């Protein structure tokens, strides 16, 4: 499998989990890799994607991996990600239910104000985390893109060499790729909209043409602030 920009940030996203997280929603789950990492922590995970092929692959991969170390905790708790083919803009999400909601390179496939429904689905103190994409529109955008190019090339070579040492992997359900679409909203536009729709959110750029947006639902511990970041 080639170097994957979204998988690269899984650890960063997992660090955003709120204490005592019990329930999660993964929006645009693809083949379910991040959903499985959540389930491995004993979290009850609902994972949705509009692409039937991706959901089928996610279910098959999960069934294959239930006996591996990655899913030991989930298997012991009798839980696995609950994959569902659905367009999150067309379904009614339970209000105040999820401790954690994740969107990995999926938000730009839907209207940005979909975050309203995702925000409302958060339990008190719950966290919405978006690993988003943006087009290059400003000098700062281009500077980050240029900085990513050599790192991206080195990472791709490292992954290719590692797979060659392991003898490569046969094509399977993990090779399924969800439909892609170019992002429309610039980083600046996203930041402005987020400040309005997600009071108190924090947003920052990442390498590999990504940004991280984190919003915590009020829990009575403090007042929200504005959208920070660079």
Regions found by a protein language model. Give the residues of each.
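Conserved alpha-helix/loop element of class I SAM-dependent methyltransferases that forms part
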Residues: 4-22
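Class I SAM-dependent methyltransferase SAM/SAH-binding core
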Residues: 25, 31-33, 37-65, 69-90
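A conserved beta-strand element that flanks and buttresses the S-adenosyl-L-methionine
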Residues: 102
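Short catalytic micro-motifs in class I SAM-dependent methyltransferases
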Residues: 105-106
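A short, conserved alpha-helix within the catalytic core of class I
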Residues: 109-118
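Short glycine-dipeptide loop
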Residues: 122-127
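Conserved class I S-adenosyl-L-methionine
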Residues: 129-158
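Short alpha-helix
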Residues: 180-199
């Amino acid at each position: 499998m080639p170097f994957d920009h979204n998988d690269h940030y899984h650890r960063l996203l997992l660090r955003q989990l709120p204490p005592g997280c019990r329930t999660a929603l993964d929006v645009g789950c693809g083949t379910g890799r991040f959903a499985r990492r959540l389930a491995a922590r004993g979290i009850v995970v609902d994972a949705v994607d509009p692409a039937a092929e991706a959901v089928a692959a996610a279910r098959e991969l999960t069934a294959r991996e239930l006996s591996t170390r990655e899913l030991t905790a989930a298997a012991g708790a009798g839980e696995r990600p609950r994959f569902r083919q659905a367009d999150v803009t067309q379904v009614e999400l339970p209000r105040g239910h999820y401790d954690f909601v994740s969107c990995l390179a999926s938000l730009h496939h839907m209207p940005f104000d979909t975050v309203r429904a995702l925000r409302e689905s958060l339990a008190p103190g719950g966290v919405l985390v978006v690993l988003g994409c943006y087009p290059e529109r400003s000098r700062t955008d281009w500077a980050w893109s240029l900085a990513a190019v050599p790192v991206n090339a080195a990472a791709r070579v490292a992954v290719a060499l590692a797979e060659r040492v392991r003898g490569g992997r046969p094509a399977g359900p993990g090779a399924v790729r969800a439909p892609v679409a170019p992002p429309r909203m610039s980083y600046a536009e996203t930041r402005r909209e987020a400040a309005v729709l997600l009071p108190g959110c924090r947003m920052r750029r990442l390498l590999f043409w990504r940004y991280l947006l984190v919003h915590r639902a009020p829990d009575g511990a403090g007042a929200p602030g504005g959208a920070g970041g660079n």
